C-alpha cells in the first residue's frame, strides 16, 4: 500500500472554540442533517462525507496546541447546482451571515462562487460548476 492508494476523504474535523454556536450555524444556516451528537463532538452528513466539529484542546489521540485568533484554519467548498447559487446567497443574507464575496463567475475555475465565514472564522465557499 502507498499513500497514492487513498481514494476517499471520508470526514473533515473542524476544531472549535465556539462549539455550540458553530453547531447551530451548520444546523440552522447551512441546514446540514445531524448524523451524530455526543458530549464532545458532533457530525453532519454532507453528501457521502461527514463534517465533524470538536472542541479545541486535548483529545483522545492528540492535542491540537495553541490557536491563533483571527486566522482561518481551513476553507470548505460545498458544491450546489448552478441555479441555486443566487438563492443560497439570499438565504445566507436573510440569516445575517456576513458575505466575504457575493456570487460571481470565476472563468478560470469554471465556477460561480460566493464566500463567507462560519463562527470559527473558517472560509466557506459555495460554488457551482459552470
Label every model-predicted segment:
Residues 123-126:
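Short glycine-/small-residue motifs
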Residues 1-9, 33-80, 87-117, 129-130:
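Vicinal oxygen chelate
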Residues 22-27, 92, 121:
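Conserved active-site tyrosine of GNAT-family acetyltransferases
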Residues 20-23, 113:
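Secondary-structure boundary/capping motif
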Residues 13-14:
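Short hydrophobic beta-strand elements that form part
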